[in-house]
Design a protein with these regions (language model features):
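Secondary-structure "cap/kink" motif recognition
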Residues: 1-294
Length: 294
């Protein structure tokens, strides 16, 4: 064997030994334990959820949102409305809260909190409250780890910081479109249909001749989707358009839409005090279907 080959062989052996030894001396995950963020009995007692979520980095701005349980459902309450939360979202959220997961202890020193963005000024904070207004749990979610697969977390009853999986990321938001079903008429025409329409000076009764146009309007409204809620006081102007629909079950639906400078429209209906935002394009399509009926 040539001298150069022997040297390369020796170097290769040394590197292989170092590689093997690196596995023997890798930092251990000592202290890892399995638990859940909340116990199942506590999850069942949740009657109110208060969110404080960073919506902008430096300078940090916090977005606030409160979900309140009324009967079997949770609602997003604003000063001018009460919006039902999607049940499948709540079910998934509560399932994650009570699920077993691995906790890796990271720090027990509050002075380390800024390193994980888990201090009060940067963390996403969620408070769970009972019906009697006592606090069940308070959770603080910090930044993700370097790989993006884990997230730092602490509870309000402990100074310890843990690393858990990042399954909660989608829920760290106060964006209404995530929590609410904005297809507000998806189930309206189950078992009934539109029998009459009034729009401005335009008044039409459903007949065999225009039945297809009415059916097209029903189909459009079933897929009709708002882009957000409108939490300001009711808005009316000379440009507000109003529509009345007479339904086959003896009820009626009244709605109005008012243009904003942004190009979107504020949308109200008679079923509740809730107000929504719809896009200019959606409003154009709605008017097209209404005006096609004669």
């Amino acid at each position: 064997m040539k001298k150069e080959t022997k040297v390369l062989f020796i170097i290769l052996c040394v590197l292989l030994c170092c590689y093997a030894l690196s596995f023997l001396h890798r930092p251990s995950r000592a202290g890892v334990f399995s638990s859940s963020l909340m116990h199942e009995p506590d999850v069942r007692e949740i009657a109110e959820i208060r969110f404080s979520i960073p919506t902008r980095a430096e300078p940090v701005e916090m977005g606030e949102m409160t979900l309140i349980k009324d009967g079997a459902r949770f609602y997003l309450r604003t000063g001018n409305g009460s919006y039902p939360v999607r049940q499948e979202i709540i079910d998934r959220f509560f399932s994650l809260l009570g699920a077993g997961r691995s906790f890796l202890p990271i720090s027990a020193r509050p002075q380390d909190y800024p390193d994980y963005q888990i201090d009060d000024g940067h963390a996403s904070r969620i408070v769970f409250v009972r019906k009697d207004k006592t606090v069940l749990s308070e959770l603080f979610f910090g930044m993700t780890d370097a790989a993006g697969a884990g997230r730092y977390v602490r509870t309000g009853t402990s100074v310890k910081v843990f690393l858990i999986d990042n399954a909660f990321e989608p829920f760290l938001t106060v964006a209404a479109p995530f929590w609410l079903d904005l297809q507000i008429y998806a189930a309206l025409f189950r078992g009934t249909g539109i029998q009459g329409l009034e729009y401005g000076n335009h008044s039409v009764i459903r007949t065999e001749a225009n039945s297809d146009a009415f059916r097209a309007l029903e189909s459009f409204l079933e897929k009709f989707s708002c882009i957000d809620i409108y939490s300001a006081p009711p808005l009316q102007s000379p440009q507000t358009a109003r529509v009345r629909l007479a339904l086959g079950n003896g009820t009626e639906l009244r709605f109005s839409f008012t243009p904003l400078q942004s190009g979107d429209y504020v949308f109200f209906d008679s079923r509740s005090a809730n107000a929504y935002l719809i896009s200019g394009y959606t409003c154009e399509q709605l008017l097209r279907h209404i005006e096609a009926i004669n």
